Amino acid sequence: MITPRLLWLLIFLSAFTGCTTQPVPQAPDPETILQAIPPADSAKYQHIRDMKKWRNPYLIVRADGVVLFDSADSAEILVKPEDLLPALAKMPASYWPYGRVVAAQENGVRGSEQDGVAIRRNKGIVGGLLQGAHIAVEWVPAA
């Protein structure tokens, strides 16, 4: 015979186990998303001399981070170097007509020697991140 106390315990346990959530699948990491973009096709961009015609992501390495220039919106998005790959991974496939390649340049304006050091440090970090994600970089001379 089931006692009322045991009955309540069984009801509580069945309600508790029925309310447990299933684990949420992890979203793919930025590198995985970026690998879905075809490799860079230099035949599509090697003839470009005026960078205003560049249609892939364009980066400007600054002392305080990296600017991701969104040509579709004419917007500049400042990100930390370590947040660059997630920001690139959020861009739609239509932003990558040349394949997995970005144009990048150093900010030509330096207020101090520390700015130059910070820009060189950020350039190294960005270069390493992009190389690790198999994204080609077309370095453009600073204006």
Where are these predicted regions, by residue range?
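Long, low-hydrophobicity, acidic/polar, solvent-exposed interaction domains
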Residues: 20-143
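C-terminal motif of bacterial Sec signal peptides marking the signal peptidase cleavage site
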Residues: 15-18
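Bacterial N-terminal signal peptides that target proteins for export
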Residues: 1-8
